[in-house]
């Protein structure tokens, strides 16, 4: 081993062969490190020793003042912009599209998209990015002859066809161990989810194989988004375009919130905004999660005055939408994610955000959209002239506490396999405490209002532990990509993604948001994209050296 060659003797370009493990440039270079291991290789019948390059990159939390030369925010095709605006218009103004027009429009979009996707996967990926937030508001039931055939399924099928065509023509992009391990973890969680569905199908007479398959496919949709982007995306340029398109789609949704605010303002009483999620708490989670991505883009260099102008109003609309959902848990998650984002980005801005949040909490009555009123009603003070002068929580908070206690009891009763997928609501009333405090609460057929407890109750403690580790891994891979990237664009995108994971981890405490395509679809796409950053970074360094 003392006769091993030095790193300087390594070849300039590594050539993968069956007898060695070279994957990237073999010479030590700025931004990369050497492993201390050596490997015996047999390339020409002779035994030699070669040093294995370490796949880890040196990193930093410092965000460059400018993007790397030749990079930045890419332009988006006009037709894609128009499609995003059309979907936003239909969802925001609640436009009812006649079936003949919908089918004709679908044919005009999907037929050209089909042929383009066979040549290159980017068109199908762009269509998926534009459509994900509207998967419930504009579901696009294509005929009803086949169960589950809608726009989501159609675009997914296009992506799979594109993957099949591209895999036969192009060489796959190298996959680093970190991305491979994360894929395996997601697969494990999906398999455990399938076991839960099978458990329900076996133990419940109300579930048939077809209904179980459709339900599982809906539960699986967000994870399919991850795998579609993970296997189809190859180039950094495509990644930039898709992330930019995502940010611009969020702007369209934020601008549409102003119209919903106008409609709700015409009501004689406060109405919680349900938005494109068609449910107030889920819509609040959507705003809370993806405000971080919009803030990250607002800090981009080279964004352009016009884009920055629309992004500013999109941000304002999303913040207003969060207030209009009146979701206290989502507001809390947004505050925590904001503090995390600016703590990493700038200590001065972090102190400003903390001061701003403190002022908002102390003056909650002035918050728009009804959130301030709901925050003030959380704690109920009894009339001083009443015999009972206790301070209690409002009915909503007391209901959640009772449901959480019931979910805990359910987990204790079924610790390994749980009660089965989608069986929580039909079983919860048996486990909630029955006393004077819960006597007047509505506790039958209720959701857990906590993703962790819901997964533990329906799927068991082993699946819950995998889920918690999955959340941790989502944060770890986003922060690692943030750490190793040297480009301002990707630094901010990765920081926004890590902040979104922080927001999701908190919103899961107050609601069952994790398997919602609308709430988590973009996050899974982002994770698949930023997992490519280390390999893009190493390829870039290798090209600079050669």
Model-derived segments and their meaning:
Residues 2-6, 33, 37, 46-50, ...:
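Alpha-helical transmembrane segments of multi-pass inner-membrane proteins
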Residues 95-106, 119-125, 145-147, 240, ...:
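Short, aromatic-rich membrane-interface segments at the entry and exit
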Residues 98-110, 132-135, 146-166, 216-225, ...:
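Membrane-embedded alpha-helical segments of multi-pass membrane proteins
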Residues 112-215:
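N-terminal hydrophobic segments of proteins, predominantly signal-anchor/transmembrane helices
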Residues 140, 208-219, 271-284, 450:
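Short aromatic-rich membrane-water interface segments that cap or initiate transmembrane helices
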Residues 264, 320, 324, 345-391, ...:
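A membrane-periplasm/extracellular boundary helix in multi-pass inner-membrane enzymes
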Residues 267-274, 387-405, 413, 417-459, ...:
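Long extracytoplasmic/lumenal interhelical loops at the membrane interface
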Residues 338, 470, 495-546:
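Transmembrane alpha-helices of multi-pass inner-membrane enzymes
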């Amino acid at each position: 081993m003392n006769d091993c060659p030095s790193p300087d003797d390594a070849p300039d370009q590594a050539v993968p062969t069956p007898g060695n493990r070279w994957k990237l440039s073999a010479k030590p270079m700025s931004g990369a490190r050497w492993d201390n291991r050596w490997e015996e290789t047999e390339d020409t019948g002779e035994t030699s020793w070669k040093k294995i390059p370490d796949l880890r990159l040196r990193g930093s939390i410092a965000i460059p003042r400018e993007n790397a030369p030749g990079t930045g925010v890419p332009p988006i095709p006009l037709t894609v912009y128009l499609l995003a605006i059309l979907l936003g218009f239909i969802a925001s103004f609640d436009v009812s599209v006649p079936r003949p027009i919908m089918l004709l429009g679908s044919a005009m979009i999907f037929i050209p998209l089909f042929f383009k996707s066979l040549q290159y996967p980017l068109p199908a990926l762009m269509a998926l990015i534009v459509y994900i937030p509207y998967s419930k508001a504009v579901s696009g039931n294509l005929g009803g002859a086949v169960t589950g055939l809608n726009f989501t399924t159609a675009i997914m099928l296009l992506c799979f066809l594109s993957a099949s065509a591209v895999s036969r023509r192009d060489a796959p992009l190298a996959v680093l161990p970190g991305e491979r391990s994360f894929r395996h973890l997601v697969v494990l969680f999906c398999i455990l989810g399938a076991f839960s569905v099978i458990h329900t199908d076996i133990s419940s007479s109300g579930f048939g194989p077809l209904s179980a398959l459709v339900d599982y496919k809906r539960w699986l949709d967000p994870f399919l988004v991850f795998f579609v982007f993970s296997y189809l995306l190859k180039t950094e340029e495509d990644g930039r375009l898709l992330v930019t398109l995502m940010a611009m789609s969020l702007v369209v949704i934020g601008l549409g919130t102003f119209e919903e605010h106008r409609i709700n303002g015409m009501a004689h009483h406060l109405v919680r905004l349900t938005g494109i999620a068609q449910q107030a708490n889920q819509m609040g989670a959507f705003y809370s999660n993806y405000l971080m991505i919009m803030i990250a883009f607002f800090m981009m260099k080279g964004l352009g005055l016009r884009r920055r102008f629309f992004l500013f109003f999109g941000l304002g609309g999303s913040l207003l939408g969060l207030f209009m959902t009146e979701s206290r848990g989502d507001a809390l998650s947004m505050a925590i994610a904001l503090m995390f984002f600016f703590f990493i980005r700038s200590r001065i801005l972090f102190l400003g955000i903390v001061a701003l949040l403190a002022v908002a909490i102390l003056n909650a009555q002035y918050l728009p959209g009804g959130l301030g009123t709901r925050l003030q009603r959380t704690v109920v003070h009894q009339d001083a002239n009443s015999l009972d002068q206790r301070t209690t929580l409002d009915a909503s908070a007391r209901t959640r506490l009772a449901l959480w206690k019931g979910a805990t009891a359910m987990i204790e009763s079924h610790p390994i396999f749980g009660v089965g997928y989608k069986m929580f609501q039909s079983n919860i009333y048996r486990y909630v405490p029955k006393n004077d405090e819960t006597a007047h609460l509505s506790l039958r057929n209720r959701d857990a209002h906590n993703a962790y407890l819901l997964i533990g109750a329906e799927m068991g403690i082993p699946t819950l532990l995998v889920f918690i580790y999955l959340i941790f891994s989502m944060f770890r891979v986003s922060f690692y990509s943030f750490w190793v990237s040297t480009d301002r664009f990707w630094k901010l995108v990765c920081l926004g993604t890590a902040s979104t994971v922080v927001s999701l981890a908190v919103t899961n405490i107050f609601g069952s948001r994790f398997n919602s395509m609308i709430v988590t679809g973009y996050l899974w796409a982002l994770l698949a994209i930023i997992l490519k950053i280390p390999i893009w970074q190493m390829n870039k360094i290798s090209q600079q050296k050669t």
